[in-house]
Amino acid sequence: MGAPGQVTLQVYVKHGCETCDRARKIAQLVDAEFPEVSVEIVDMNESQPQREDVFAVPTYVLEDHILSLGNPQESELREEIKALLRVRGLV
């Protein structure tokens, strides 16, 4: 997980998943825009998910809570992250 004081976003993907390519790009955008967010790409081809509730890809998990099955609207993802950062006092 992320360093203390950081928020963690995990994005579960698989090779050959067309929408997962977009998920990787969204993850890169979040990583560039929010230095307070630790972004982790979890490739389900390489390892089994540690979560039983991740059964589809892409899946976005923000601070241990499933935020989206499938790619969210970028604006909605930004708002969710900003809201969590405000609650945590990181912005």
Identify the function of each model-found stretch.
Residues 1-33:
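Local sequence-structure signature of Cys/Sec-based thiol-disulfide redox active-site neighborhoods
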Residues 22-23, 53, 73:
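Residues at alpha-helix caps and immediate loop-helix transition turns in enzyme cores, especially N-
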Residues 35-48:
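Thiol-based oxidoreductase modules, predominantly thioredoxin-like and allied folds used
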Residues 52-61:
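Structural micro-motif
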Residues 62-91:
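Non-catalytic, surface beta->alpha helical segment in thiol-disulfide oxidoreductase systems
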